[in-house]
Design a protein with these regions (language model features):
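ABC-type nucleotide-binding domain
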Residues: 1-169
């Protein structure tokens, strides 16, 4: 299949159909045994994994958070980001107000694998991380699956804005 730059493509199918495999192939977690994966006409096997990973942002269904602060977990998408940039990404992901209610704000530690946060809060931190990274290609792997309907609608609006002029799966 082909996804033109700046367009969005929804990949739908039952569990085990290979939806997540597509993102793994894009990231070169493994190479194809047949056929090719091209990004902007270039075979991903001819590019470094680092450059691919810099160009692609993923919001997975099962968010990975580090046993560190909320700020660190958001800024992981762009090391060296300023506090203002981190907070702006958090606002877009609808998590800033929640963070500001915590006793230590952005300095709050999330615990091992983010266990101190709900599924929806972890998901919003992951979305903020990807927004901050500002990649050319977005992969949203059931990115709003852990959110309530109201929050999902708010984040969908933010994701539409972030997806503008980016290739999105």
């Amino acid at each position: 299949f082909t996804v033109p730059p700046g367009r969005t493509l929804a990949i739908v199918g039952p569990t085990g159909a290979g939806k997540s495999t597509i993102s793994r192939l894009l990231f070169r977690f493994y190479d194809t045994t047949g056929g090719r994966v091209l990004v902007d006409g270039q075979d991903v096997r001819d590019v470094t994994q680092l450059s691919l990973r810099n160009a692609i942002g993923v919001v997975p269904q099962d968010t990975v958070l580090f046993n560190d602060t909320i700020r660190y977990n958001i800024a992981y998408g762009r090391p060296g980001a300023t506090d203002e940039q981190v907070e702006q990404a958090a606002r877009h992901a609808q998590v800033h107000d929640f963070v500001m209610k915590l006793p230590e704000g952005y300095r709050t530690r999330v615990g091992e694998r983010g266990l101190k946060l709900s599924g929806g809060e972890k998901q919003r931190v992951a979305i903020a991380r990807t927004i901050l990274k500002n990649p050319r290609i977005l992969i949203l792997d059931e990115a709003t699956s852990a959110l309530d309907t109201r929050t999902e609608q708010e984040i969908q609006a933010a994701l539409r804005e972030v997806s503008r002029d980016r290739t999105t799966l």
